[in-house]
C-alpha cells in the first residue's frame, strides 16, 4: 500500500517483482531507499529491510538516503527529518545491519551521512565504509573528507591540476560518458584541461572564506578547528 501510494500507481506495490528477474539473471543491483519521515520510515522501514533480506538477499547494496526538499515542494506531508527521527533511523539501520551480517555474512545496508549530521551524531569510522563504494549516494562523504583533510586517508575524489577542470565537447548534443550515470557529481574526465587562477596570498585582515551549505558548514568548522585553522571563515548558505 505504501509503495503504491508513493508511486501514485495502484500497481506500484508489485514493482519489485522485476528485481528478482534481474537478480536471477546475474544482474547486479544497487538499491536505494528514499526515506520520507512519517511515510516510509519507522515500522515501514523495518518491514522493507526485512522483505529485502528475505526476498532479495543478493542485492549488491542498499543505500538509505533522506528526502530532499526545496521551497518549490508542493507536497504538504513531505518534510525533513527531525533530530530525534534521524537518531531513530540510525538505531534501526544499525540493528538491521547486524541482522544482515548474521543472515548472509555481509552488510549491504549503507546510511547517508545526512542522518548523522541531523542527529548530531559522529559519522562512523573509516573501516565502516570499506572502499567507499557509495560516495555518489552521500554515503561516506564526510568521513572521506575528514580523513583527507587530516592527512590520514586517501583522496578518494581524485586530484586535478589547477583550480578548475573542464572538458571539451564538440557539440552540445554529444554524449559525454560519466563514471556513474546514476549520480554523477562532477567533471572527472582523465583528459580534462586544467584552468588555473592567479594565486592570491591572503592578508591578515582578509581571511580565506569557504562557502558551503548548512551541513557542510558544520563539518568544515569542526575540521578547521581540529587542525587549528583559525584564519579561515566558513560562510553558510541555506538551501531553499
Regions found by a protein language model. Give the residues of each.
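Gly/Ser/Thr-rich loops at beta-strand to alpha-helix junctions
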Residues: 39, 67-70, 110-117, 213-218
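Short glycine-/acidic-enriched loop or helix-start segments at secondary-structure transitions
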Residues: 74, 121, 220-221
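Conserved AdoMet/S-adenosylmethionine-binding subsite of the radical SAM
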Residues: 1-101, 127, 141-142
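Hard-cation-handling environments
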Residues: 90-212
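A generic structural motif
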Residues: 61-66, 109-113, 230-239
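Redox- and metal-dependent alpha/beta enzyme cores, enriched for Fe-S-associated oxidoreductases
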Residues: 195-240
Amino acid at each position: 500500500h505504501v509503495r503504491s501510494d508513493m508511486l501514485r500507481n495502484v500497481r506500484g506495490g508489485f514493482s519489485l517483482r522485476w528485481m528478482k528477474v534481474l537478480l536471477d539473471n546475474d544482474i547486479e543491483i544497487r538499491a536505494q531507499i528514499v526515506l520520507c519521515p512519517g511515510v516510509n520510515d519507522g515500522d515501514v522501514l523495518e518491514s522493507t529491510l526485512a522483505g529485502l533480506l528475505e526476498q532479495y538477499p543478493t542485492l549488491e547494496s542498499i543505500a538509505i538516503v533522506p528526502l530532499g526538499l526545496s521551497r518549490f515542494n508542493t507536497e504538504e506531508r513531505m518534510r525533513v527529518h527531525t533530530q530525534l527521527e534521524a537518531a531513530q533511523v540510525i538505531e534501526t539501520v544499525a540493528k538491521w545491519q547486524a541482522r544482515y551480517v548474521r543472515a548472509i555474512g555481509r552488510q549491504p545496508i549503507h546510511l547517508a551521512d545526512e542522518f548523522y549530521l541531523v542527529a548530531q551524531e559522529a559519522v562512523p569510522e573509516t573501516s565502516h565504509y570499506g572502499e567507499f563504494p557509495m560516495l555518489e549516494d552521500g554515503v561516506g562523504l564526510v568521513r572521506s573528507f575528514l580523513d583527507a583533510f587530516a592527512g590520514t586517508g586517501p583522496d578518494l575524489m581524485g586530484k586535478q591540476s589547477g583550480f578548475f577542470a573542464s572538458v571539451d565537447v564538440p557539440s552540445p548534443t554529444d554524449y559525454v560518458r560519466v563514471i556513474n550515470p546514476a549520480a554523477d557529481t562532477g567533471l572527472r574526465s582523465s583528459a580534462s584541461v586544467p584552468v588555473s587562477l592567479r594565486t592570491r596570498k591572503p592578508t591578515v585582515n582578509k581571511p580565506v572564506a569557504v562557502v558551503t551549505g548548512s551541513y557542510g558548514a558544520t563539518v568544515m568548522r569542526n575540521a578547521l578547528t581540529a587542525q587549528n585553522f583559525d584564519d579561515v571563515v566558513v560562510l553558510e548558505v541555506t538551501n531553499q
